From Swiss-Prot:
<dbReference type="InterPro" id="IPR005336">
    <property type="entry name" value="MPC"/>
</dbReference>
<dbReference type="GO" id="GO:0005739">
    <property type="term" value="C:mitochondrion"/>
</dbReference>
<keyword id="KW-0472">Membrane</keyword>
<dbReference type="GO" id="GO:0005743">
    <property type="term" value="C:mitochondrial inner membrane"/>
</dbReference>
<keyword id="KW-0999">Mitochondrion inner membrane</keyword>
<keyword id="KW-1133">Transmembrane helix</keyword>
<keyword id="KW-0496">Mitochondrion</keyword>
<dbReference type="GO" id="GO:0006850">
    <property type="term" value="P:mitochondrial pyruvate transmembrane transport"/>
</dbReference>
<dbReference type="GO" id="GO:0050833">
    <property type="term" value="F:pyruvate transmembrane transporter activity"/>
</dbReference>
<comment type="subunit">
    <text>The functional 150 kDa pyruvate import complex is a heteromer of mpc1 and mpc2.</text>
</comment>
<comment type="function">
    <text>Mediates the uptake of pyruvate into mitochondria.</text>
</comment>
<protein>
    <recommendedName>
        <fullName>Probable mitochondrial pyruvate carrier 1</fullName>
    </recommendedName>
</protein>
<keyword id="KW-0813">Transport</keyword>
<feature type="transmembrane region" description="Helical">
    <location>
        <begin position="31"/>
        <end position="52"/>
    </location>
</feature>
<feature type="transmembrane region" description="Helical">
    <location>
        <begin position="60"/>
        <end position="82"/>
    </location>
</feature>
<comment type="similarity">
    <text>Belongs to the mitochondrial pyruvate carrier (MPC) (TC 2.A.105) family.</text>
</comment>
<keyword id="KW-0812">Transmembrane</keyword>
Length: 141
């Protein structure tokens, strides 16, 4: 084992020791009992559900709900950054959710107004049709 490997091993041991010390501390128990931990943890259900929906038919995607979730997560990312102390778990949860919901939004737009709908109608025609008949859940052919 050379000198750099010994140094990196000592650094890893030091980080591990500090982490274990923190796990045993009253501060960690206080964190586990706070909404700073449980709120974001329970919030991770939303992006997990969105990931599971990535393989489903794009007809099932609600454009309004996807847009609302993108906006909601963007607002709460800002909140998680500005609150004191900063809530990095909440920030990560909402950054993850914004990313996944944006992917769902892209699938929605591509299906209803873009690539998949381009062969039948122009994007403009699809948008105008959706504006005239927002309650119709299927594309007119």
């Amino acid at each position: 084992m050379n000198a750099s490997e010994k140094l990196s091993q000592k650094a890893a041991q030091s980080v591990t020791r500090r982490f274990i010390t923190w796990l045993k501390s009253p501060d960690f128990r206080k964190y586990l009992c706070s909404t700073h931990f449980w709120g974001p943890l329970s919030n991770f259900g939303i992006p997990i559900a969105a990931i599971l929906d990535l393989k489903k038919d794009p007809r099932l995607i609600s454009g309004r709900m996807t847009g609302a979730l993108i906006l909601y997560s963007s607002v709460f990312m800002r909140y998680a950054w500005m609150v004191s102390p900063r809530n990095y778990l909440l920030l990560g949860c909402h950054a993850f959710n914004t990313t996944v919901q944006t992917a769902q939004g892209i699938r929605f737009v591509n299906f209803w107004y873009g690539k998949e709908g381009a062969s039948k109608q122009s994007v403009f025609e699809n948008i105008m049709q959706a504006a005239k008949h927002p309650e119709s859940g299927t594309r007119q052919k």
